[in-house]
Amino acid sequence: MAAINRDDVAHLARLAHIEMSAEELDRMAVELAVIVDSVKSVSEAAGEDVPATSHPIPLTNVFREDVVGHTFTAEQALSGAPDSYENRFKVPAILDED
């Protein structure tokens, strides 16, 4: 087990402004030691000959290619709009201009 004791946990609790009882300090010392040991074993598992990866298997883009299809002209897009200005949709202001 990792060398994390009750005093280390109490110090971390003080730094984090967390109040912990004696029982909580003891239990947390054991739990943190297990976590540190687990992280240590994972870091030892990957050797220097293993390249860093973001995914365990190679991924390719599974989505379709972007293909330009039928598009509207500005006039067609704005034809059903209640109001427009300079080929843009005109909407009520939602923020004050200061």
Curated annotation (Swiss-Prot):
EC number: 6.3.5.-
Superkingdom to which the source organism belongs: Bacteria
GO MF assignments: asparaginyl-tRNA synthase (glutamine-hydrolyzing) activity; ATP binding; glutaminyl-tRNA synthase (glutamine-hydrolyzing) activity
Family, similarity comment: Belongs to the GatC family.
Organism: Paenarthrobacter aurescens (strain TC1)
Key words of the record: ATP-binding, Ligase, Nucleotide-binding, Protein biosynthesis
Quaternary structure note: Heterotrimer of A, B and C subunits.
Transmembrane segments: none
Name assigned to this protein: Aspartyl/glutamyl-tRNA(Asn/Gln) amidotransferase subunit C
